[in-house]
From Swiss-Prot:
One of its GO terms (molecular function) is tRNA binding. It catalyses: tRNA(Ala) + L-alanine + ATP = L-alanyl-tRNA(Ala) + AMP + diphosphate. This is Alanine--tRNA ligase. InterPro entries: aa-tRNA-synth_II/BPL/LPL, Ala-tRNA-lgiase_IIc, Ala-tRNA-ligase_IIc_anticod-bd, Ala-tRNA-synth_IIc_core, Ala-tRNA-synth_IIc_N, Ala-tRNA_lgiase_arc, Ala-tRNA_ligase, Thr/Ala-tRNA-synth_IIc_edit. Zn(2+) binds at residues 596, 600, 700, 704. Its cofactor is Zn(2+). Pfam families: tRNA-synt_2c, tRNA_SAD. Its EC number is 6.1.1.7. It comes from Methanococcus maripaludis (strain DSM 14266 / JCM 13030 / NBRC 101832 / S2 / LL). Its main location: cytoplasm. Catalyzes the attachment of alanine to tRNA(Ala) in a two-step reaction: alanine is first activated by ATP to form Ala-AMP and then transferred to the acceptor end of tRNA(Ala). Also edits incorrectly charged Ser-tRNA(Ala) and Gly-tRNA(Ala) via its editing domain. The lineage of its organism: Archaea, Methanobacteriati, Methanobacteriota, Methanomada group, Methanococci.
Length: 892
């Protein structure tokens, strides 16, 4: 469709704004200044607020949040609480909250759910890591920023306001702050994002963009646009930029973190830098519209020229201060990440949090800050507690996770040298892909990799090329920032699309009913589709019900698009239009109900024991056992497992009612928060809420007990670390727990009988046997070492000279460990050892001066694998044939 948007609004006519075209960039803009020829934005105009505040008073960040919110509150906008910076809490397409409108996507913006208030105002903290390498260097970039926004959701039945009022509000707010109206320009622009589009104004003053006013009204389909029924006012005001412009500091960082910056400078012993230098750098950065690291190098050169200083001297002077700016920004970002419950890991939002944390730790090391990162983040929490008290409430978790992560980082750095050396041994260049692999797989920052390679180049025989891009962290963050849907491999045949009404789910109204009558709507292969059913279809981690339809076995139950498919053992017994009698297997259903309710109980107990950061990442509810996956930053200890189990059974014995209600989505979120989505994001404007009184509330479509006592005894069977940052708890309920406890008791009694001791002596006896075994193992290892030394002398005369190497190929009687001990004694200098035993075991080991890869060698003379200096496997040819092959390889 053709779009011709008129950017003229009522305010422009009333106040005499003129529409002009910028002589520098050719963009159209509106201004009160009749003499203006440029649009006002950088790089067409430079920053003119540095050292020259543009408001009638200076505002701190906290004051600006209040000023913005109060203004729109007065204008009839209801203030709403911020959402977490973890967008994954309510949507499954992005990991972090990147804009205020993200809070209302996809449910409100699609029209499926009404907004919680309309119109509304919000000050939403956001995180974007696509410019993380620019933070500290340009004077304006932040990883964490607050988007002040007023939103109006206009429909035919509920129209609020559109372009006229939006522009009027913006201009009035800026004038109330004391900004000269003649300095304000409204640039005509166009916005697209998330499949939507619309015209917008970029609101500029003194060279800096302070707000964007978007009028979301189109859906983008390919290269075309289609009008959407909901017309959305989507504004974004840069709260930090308003505070910066009101203070006129050299960079945005001084306006936000002045106290922290001063303490970090003092701690690191960094000399004062002339404010004019930093102001010049920030001003030129604005003029250059920094987008990449190449621009940053040019920026440094331009600043040096402007102030008459050598570029290397300038770099030495301001780089430490730029690191401090980045540390101040990153620690605020981490305060929100961890305060909103992110658990560091090697995937998804946990990966991004760890990236920011390790980059911060590296910068702290680089400039010699002795203050701990916990101290810095404690200052951030203190500064923000007036506006964000909920972050301070998470301080204990934040401090614990920082401790755990700092230890992991130190361990990573300590083992990093060996990892890099092994990679470098077979390479002439460490590429960007290598650096990313070392970071993703081993957590090694690229700066450490470069330090190791530089050392190797000084000592080694060859030169290994390496270049660390200045935007390395931006590159890896962008690879991980978007949520990628997990690939689900299903062994089940895809269910067909059917044009029949959705199946009525009777078990919601009648959870204990087991028999019903229904009409057959469709027969599809082995599936029967009914108009209503008591059978629960597999979903939400819970297994399907089993039972009978007209005495024919129901083997599987699945659901697609609200239609339930019943797989039966004999489809020939059913016809479309028939009325059938169904019966759910109650014993099977009861086991599923117990285990599903227990899942909620254990999740609540784990949260009490481990902390509010605990978040369910998956579950599996079967008849025999249940499984719950939760986020946690370290292994769950035995004592913690016992406490989780104790609390869970306390809840069971308390006979807490389990209530099921259907609620409006907004009402549920407002009442209970986003923790209702522990089991995953649930679509629709109405949610089924399962509330265990005083214990747990979740949006859930599963079958549950009527009170917790019906679960019976809950037994946590085991825990395991299924991935970094995720713990799995496996448990049983009721008679399943009785069986598990009986099995454990049998194991205990059988073990005691084998050892011929009373049950209560088992731990003590096993400990004694274990200590004795360790001593015997140590003795055996010492004997093996001595045998190896003796065999060394026996084999010393059996080496043959082949080219530049001394080669030994020998069949030796012994275990793999014994052969390894022999090879360790012999493999020095230019010696190459190949040993075989009577069980077809093959071992290849080289001395430090042998360049041939043992991994490659073993593949040519047998089967196996390993590393360049050591390989193990199997052989099938005799000693003479293997020797001949080795000679041929070495003589090539």
């Amino acid at each position: 469709m053709e779009i011709n948007h008129d950017y003229r609004v009522k305010l422009f006519d009333e106040l005499g704004f003129e529409r002009k075209q910028c002589t520098e960039c050719n963009q159209w803009f509106w201004t009160l200044d009749k003499d203006r020829t440029t649009c006002g934005d950088s790089p067409c105009d430079e920053y003119s607020f540095i050292g020259n505040p543009i408001t009638s008073k200076k505002y701190t960040y906290n004051e600006m949040v209040k000023e913005f919110t109060n203004f729109f509150d007065e204008k009839g906008h209801t203030p709403v609480k911020r959402s977490p910076v973890v967008a994954k809490r309510w949507r499954d397409d992005i990991l972090l909250t990147i804009a205020s409108i993200a809070v209302f996507q996809p449910w409100v913006t699609s029209g499926l759910v009404k907004p919680v208030k309309n119109p509304l105002v919000i000050a939403q903290p956001c995180i974007r890591l696509n410019d993380i390498d620019n933070v500290g260097r340009t004077g304006r970039h932040l990883t964490c920023f607050t988007m002040g926004a007023h939103h109006a959701f206009n429909s035919k039945d509920d129209y609020k306001y559109w372009t006229d009022k939006t522009v009027e509000y913006c201009f009035e707010l800026m004038q109330r702050l004391g900004i000269d109206g003649k300095t304000i320009t409204f640039i005509e622009s166009w916005w697209e994002g998330g499949g939507n589009a619309g015209p917008c104004y970029e609101v500029i003053t003194h060279g800096v963009e302070l707000a964007t006013l978007v009028f979301m009204q189109y859906k983008k389909i390919g290269n075309d646009y289609e009008e959407i029924p909901l017309k959305i006012v989507d504004t974004g005001y840069g709260i930090e930029r308003f505070a910066w412009a009101s203070q006129g500091t050299p960079t945005v960082y001084e306006s936000l973190f002045s106290e922290i910056i001063e303490k970090l400078k003092e701690d690191a012993g960094i000399p004062e830098v002339d404010e004019k230098i930093m102001a010049e750098s920030a001003t030129l950065a604005g003029l250059m519209d920094i987008e990449n690291v190449g621009d940053l190098r040019v920026l440094r050169q331009k600043v040096a020229e402007k102030i008459g200083m050598d570029v290397d001297e300038l770099d030495k002077l301001i780089s430490p201060l730029e690191y401090i700016y980045a540390i101040a920004d990153h620690t605020r970002c981490l305060s929100f990440m961890f305060g909103d419950g992110i658990v560091p890991s090697n995937v998804k939002e946990g990966y991004l949090a760890r990236l920011v944390l390790r980059k911060t730790l590296r910068y702290m090391e680089k400039i010699g800050i002795s203050m701990s990162i916990k101290d810095i983040i404690s200052m951030q929490l203190e500064n923000m507690k007036e506006i964000y008290p909920e972050l301070s409430a998470m301080k204990e978790y934040i401090m614990d996770v920082l401790d755990a992560e700092e230890k992991k980082y130190i361990q990573t750095v300590n083992r990093g040298r060996g990892i890099v050396e092994r990679m470098a041994a077979s390479k002439s260049e460490i590429t960007l892909d290598d650096l990313i692999e070392l970071y993703d797989s081993n957590g090694l920052p690229p700066e450490i990799v470069k330090d190791v390679v530089d050392d190797l180049n000084k000592k080694g025989k060859k030169t290994i090329a390496i270049t660390v891009p200045d935007n390395f962290y931006t590159i890896v963050a962008e690879r991980h920032e978007e949520e990628k849907p997990e690939e689900v491999v299903s062994t089940k045949k895809e269910l067909p699309e059917l044009e029949v009404s959705k199946t009525e789910l009777l078990f919601f109204k009648h959870p204990t009913q087991v028999e019903f009558e229904a009409k057959v709507l469709k027969i599809v292969e082995k599936y029967v589709v009914l108009d209503k059913t008591l059978f629960y279809a597999e979903g939400g981690g819970q297994k399907y019900d089993i039972g009978q339809l007209n005495d024919i076995e129901v083997m599987d139950v699945q659901k697609k698009n609200g239609i339930v498919f019943h797989k039966v053992s004999d489809i020939s017994k059913f016809k479309e239009g028939d009325t059938v009698k169904g019966a759910v297997n109650w014993d099977n259903r009861l086991k599923l109900m117990r285990n599903h309710t227990a899942t909620h109980v254990i999740n609540a107990a784990a949260t009490r024991v481990l902390g509010k950061h605990v978040w369910q990442t998956g579950s599996n509810v079967d008849t025999e056992k249940g499984r719950l996956d939760i986020t946690h930053y370290e292994r769950i200890s035995r004592e913690q497992v016992k406490e989780i189990e104790r609390i869970a059974n306390e809840i069971v014995l308390s006979k807490m009612p389990v209530n099921s209600t259907f609620m409006d989505r907004n009402d549920a979120e407002q009442k209970y928060g986003f923790t209702i989505y522990q089991g995953g994001v649930v679509p629709g404007d109405t949610l089924r809420i399962i509330e265990i009184e005083g214990t747990d509330v979740e949006a859930c479509g599963g079958t549950h007990c009527s009170n917790t006592s019906e679960c019976g005894y809950i037994k946590v069977l085991k825990t395991e670390r299924i991935q970094d940052g995720v713990e799995r708890l496996e448990y049983s309920t009721g008679m399943g727990s009785v069986s598990e406890i009986a099995s454990l008791e049998d194991t205990l009694i059988d073990s005691a009988e084998i050892l011929g001791i009373p049950n209560d002596q088992l731990p003590k006896t096993v400990k004694r046997f274990f200590e004795e075994w360790k001593e015997q193992k140590k003795t055996i290892e010492e004997l093996q070492k001595k045998v190896g030394e003796l065999v060394k002398y026996e084999l010393a005369d059996k080496f043959e000279n082949v080219g530049n190497y001394e080669v030994l190929v020998e069949q030796v009687s012994g275990t793999p460990n014994e052969l390894m001990s022999i090879a360790d004694n012999l493999a020095v200098g230019n010696k190459l050892i190949v040993l075989m035993n009577e069980n077809d075991y093959l071992l290849c080991k080289r001395g430090e001066n042998v360049e041939l890869s043992m991994k490659d060698l073993i593949r040519n003379i047998g089967k196996g694998g390993g590393k360049d200096n050591l390989a193990q496997g199997k052989y099938s040819e005799n000693k003479e044939q293997i020797t001949e092959k080795i000679i041929q390889i070495l003589n090539k």
